[in-house]
Structure formats: C-alpha cells, structure tokens
Amino acid sequence: MERRKRPRLQLRLNVEFSSAEGQAGGFGITDNVSAGGVYFLTPDWQGLRTGQNLALRLSGMNNSTDWPVFRTLGCKATVLRLDVPPDRKVPHAKAGVAMRFDDRPRVDMYGLTA
C-alpha cells in the first residue's frame, strides 16, 4: 500500500547538500522528487545521519522553451532515511537518502530568486 501523500516524479537532477555545522556535505543525483521531499543517491553519505538538517540545492536544465533555462531550487530539509550500501568499503559506493523539505523550495533562475 502506497503511504506517500504526494506523487513522485522520476527526475534526474543534480543535488548539492551541506549541514550548518559543516560536518556533512557533498553531491548526488535525484532518483525522484515530490512537492514534499526528495530521494537521491550520493557517494558522500558517510557524514549523514537520520534527523539531520541540511541545506539542499537541486539543479537541472529545463528545455520547455526554445533555449534551455538553467534552474536551481534551494531549501532546508531533514534526512528521514539513509539506505547505506551493503558493502560500505567499496570506494565511491552510493547510499540512498530520503529527505523531507522543511520549507518551500525557492526557485533561482540565472541567479535571480523568484
């Protein structure tokens, strides 16, 4: 039975994340995104923990016009689940990270916040 309140979109976006304490940070690629959160894969998972608050930036290309528009969404989010790889010793093994948006994502287009 599906427990999600919001539908998920299968989107591949770049993810950049950082903690306020500077203890965790890195990059990843989204697996899916909804209005309430995101699930992404990252090799930079070692400093992450459930319940941790992070700053997120999601970016990608929008080709809905005649020319591509680069867009970035920024927000605060909380780690809900960390799916660590079975063999943690493999270099660059990726973990799945489920996050809930804590505030409404802000759209940044060419550096102008809307």
Where are these regions (language model features)?
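Structured alpha-helical
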Residues: 1-114
